Amino acid sequence: MLRQNRAGLLLVRKLHCSVVVMKPFDISQLARDNSSEKRNQGFNIESLIKNRMDLETDKVVSENATAAPNRFATMFDKEKRQAQKKTGPRRNSESTHHHNAGPYPKKPYGKTNSGSKTRPEIKTRPHKRVVRFEFKTGSDQAQAALKSIIAKVHALSTNYKIKFIDPVSGEVKLSNLVDIANSTDLREAGLQLLPCKEGDLPSIKKVSTREMLKLYSDELAAEKEKALLQSGSVAAQRALNQRLKSERKKSAAKLLNIFWNISLGDLKNQKKTELANRLCKGETFTIYLKRKGREVATPEGEGDEESETLNMYDIRRSLAHDEDALNIETQRRELISQQLFCILDEMPCTYEVEGQKENKLKVTVSPRQDAVKQSISPSSEECTLSAKDLKKQRQLQKQKEREELLKLKKQEKEDNLDSLYSFKIED
């Protein structure tokens, strides 16, 4: 009985303390109280008596627990909020500091002494220049070409700052593309974007409208061809191959190979005519005097190992491989080179000679602009004719020769028949 009364008193006391302190009651403590350690302890009557000192301490603990600050309760307290409305926020308060926080200082929004409401001050930023390109002149194609140049410049310089080459003085000046484009009459002139280094301002110069349109059309054609090649077009691949072949022919047309074993008659007749035709067209070309072992002339500085001096390979067809044959070949090369120089001296051109006769000679020939064209083997009419016209004339001439040959053959047959008939009649 005493043990049961003791446990009941302890339970009542703990419930009372939890209610006063506003803390949840931990039921697990009952298990701790009923542990074996407390069972072994003896009965203590003093624990059942709650003296005056214990009551006073419990009262102090309960007052401290109820007086603990609650920030949500104080924040939403009606009396304090009404008092703040009457007095207004303090200047150095946290709310004012939070209101003024930002990139620009702001004044507290409220009534001033005069009674008018003040608005926060906003600093105005400097006004940016409005970029406007005007397309009032020129055709649609010219305007499209100018727009493509503007797009390229914008990719290099977003503010359209450029280096403009003055067409009169040729000086390079810093300018803006807006001013240059708007002041250009596309009916008379156009613009061209020059290649520049990475990080530099783009360079612009004035060109003719025709040249600007040609560059723009070439650019569009290249983009179209690239797209067709990526899609696997066979026609585009064939056109590309044809263009590459024509470019190779043009580059090969600027070279003229003359071998050391050429005869003097061919040099005076055939090669002289070919040189005259090229000079009449105003071409600048290069002549290579070399041995027949190489078909393509190598530029300077390349193939030094193959370009050995005159040796037995140059006279491999000779029967006697001795010094006499070597001297004969040297004299022959001297004679051919001197004959070529005499032919060039008779023509209205200038030339420069490089190399050695023991290996090969490189002769760069350029026509003289001021010199009067002399009457060389090809007539002046042949020089003015184009390549197609010359080809047609040659074809007509060959056709005439064939017709004449056919006529001669027919006459021979008829004569043979007449002679045969006359022979039979006589018999």
Curated annotation (Swiss-Prot):
Disordered: region residues: 71-125, 372-396
Q: What is its main location?
A: mitochondrion
Span of chain positions assigned to the transit peptide in the UniProt entry = 1-22
Annotated localization: Mitochondrion
Q: Could you list the residue ranges forming a coiled coil in this record?
A: none
Instruction: Tell me yes or no: is Mitochondrion among this UniProt entry's keywords.
Output: yes
Pull one GO CC term from this UniProt entry.
Answer: mitochondrion
Q: Where is the composition biased (Polar residues)?
A: 372-383
Q: Which UniProt keywords are present, listed alphabetically?
A: Mitochondrion, Transit peptide
UniProt keyword Kinase present: no
Record-linked InterPro entries: AIM23
Family that this chain belongs to: Belongs to the AIM23 family.
Name-wise, this protein is: Altered inheritance of mitochondria protein 23, mitochondrial
Question: Native species of this protein?
Answer: Scheffersomyces stipitis (strain ATCC 58785 / CBS 6054 / NBRC 10063 / NRRL Y-11545)
Q: What is the lineage of its organism?
A: Eukaryota, Fungi, Dikarya, Ascomycota, Saccharomycotina
